[in-house]
Amino acid sequence: NKVLFIDGDIKRDVFLGKYKLGKNAKGVIDYLKNPNKNHEIICVTNHKGLDIIFTGINDDEIVTRDERDVFKNLLEKYSNDYDYIVVDTDEDGLLAQYCDKTMIIKDEEAYSVEDMNEEVNRLEADGCSILGVVIRE
């Protein structure tokens, strides 16, 4: 299976820093800010069948509603090339509504049933289809 992992957490560039690519790697933000430009945003990994699109550079950490709508186009653009597209989004789930299914992952110490029910209800109201919640230690 071919998998495309998209780092859609626009508030933090965890994966970009982890792979020590510096601040020059183009990614999701570059596509959202200028969708008509032909960006080379897919990074091929050394794991067969796994490619990554990093966050890219977002100096203001703001993505407009129109730019979020462009994210749907990004998913559609690559959906025929990959068996699965996995998106890591920010805590607000700004991009989750454009995904077919959503899985919420929470740290055990940050988990409460009340907060989780609130988050699930909010995401469902935004049009997300929630598969479930994973609580990690």
What are these regions (language model features)?
Residues N1-K2, C128:
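Short phosphate-binding/catalytic loops that engage adenosine nucleotides
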